[in-house]
Regions:
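N-terminal, membrane-interfacial amphipathic/helix-forming hydrophobic leader that caps
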Residues: 1-99, 118, 122, 150, ...
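Membrane interface segments of multi-pass transport proteins and intramembrane proteases
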Residues: 50-53, 91, 121-129, 175-183
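Transmembrane alpha-helix/helix-exit interface in multi-pass inner-membrane proteins
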Residues: 106-131
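Transmembrane helix-loop-helix hairpins at the membrane interface
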Residues: 111-114, 134-245
Length: 245
């Protein structure tokens, strides 16, 4: 990971000329990493978790670390198979301009996603009620406290944006874009990103958030801006719940 002070003066997305993993291979590696980390190890951790903790902060952290580890192994395997270094294959670099992702993430959380739900709530008020949308996050915040709150913030604001952007933008969006074109890859990866969270009520918002993160990659060809945007998006949501819950 590096901070590069230079700029992309040509205005051409680097993803269009950077190496990528073949889409079928990318999906196979993701599937293996997600299944082993999320289903196998995650299931074991959940089964062994204490009744008091339930799906609280400690269990969430352990499950997240297990899932992230397996996904990172999948990314490392992709690098070995393509004989390309990690930074180059997934576009992992940062520039100072990527800090624009901070206000973009905030705006996406407080304006863009809520606007998406307005027509959905008008048509299906009970399904897309705000309490249903916030249910999972509120449960996590309620289970935290003291040092567990710090741990929750690290998981949500640091770990999740870094690993998820590497996987869903660095691996899958770049691979899908090589096969389907930049716009096709953007939409496919964004919808996929919403689906894998396995909460239908959150699918529209997460897919739109994925579009925002993906556009940052598409515009820069690097993950720096998308990671910062994702972190800002998550931070806005979690701190709002911590302050107003």
């Amino acid at each position: 990971m590096s901070i590069d002070a230079s700029s992309n003066s040509a205005g051409v997305s680097l993803s269009e000329r950077s190496p990528s993993v073949p889409l079928g291979q990318a999906l196979a590696l993701w599937s293996l990493g997600w299944s082993v980390g999320g289903i196998v190890f995650g299931g074991v951790i959940y089964a062994l978790s204490s009744t008091e903790d339930g799906t609280g902060t400690l269990t969430l952290t352990a499950m997240a670390v297990a899932s992230w580890t397996c996904l990172l192994v999948a990314l490392w395997t992709a690098c070995r198979m393509q004989a390309v270094d990690f930074r180059t294959l997934f576009g992992l670099s940062f520039r100072w301009i990527d800090l624009i992702g901070i206000p973009v993430g905030v705006l996406a959380q407080v304006i863009v996603v809520p606007v998406i739900y307005l027509p959905l709530r008008a048509i299906w008020p009970s399904t897309f009620d705000s309490s249903a949308l916030e249910e999972t996050a509120k449960e996590l915040v309620d289970s935290a406290g003291g040092w567990k709150t710090v741990l929750l913030v690290l998981v949500v604001v640091v770990g999740a944006p870094l690993v998820e952007e590497l996987v869903y933008r660095g691996l899958l969006q770049r691979s899908a874009s090589a096969r389907l074109g930049p716009v096709g890859g953007l939409f496919v990866a964004s919808i996929f990103f919403g689906l894998i969270h396995l909460r239908p009520v959150e699918l529209p918002g997460l897919a739109v958030a994925g579009l925002v993160f993906g556009i940052m990659l598409l515009r820069t060809g690097r993950l720096g801006a998308s990671i910062i945007t994702h972190a800002s998006f998550n931070a806005t949501g979690i701190f709002a719940l911590l302050l107003f819950n």
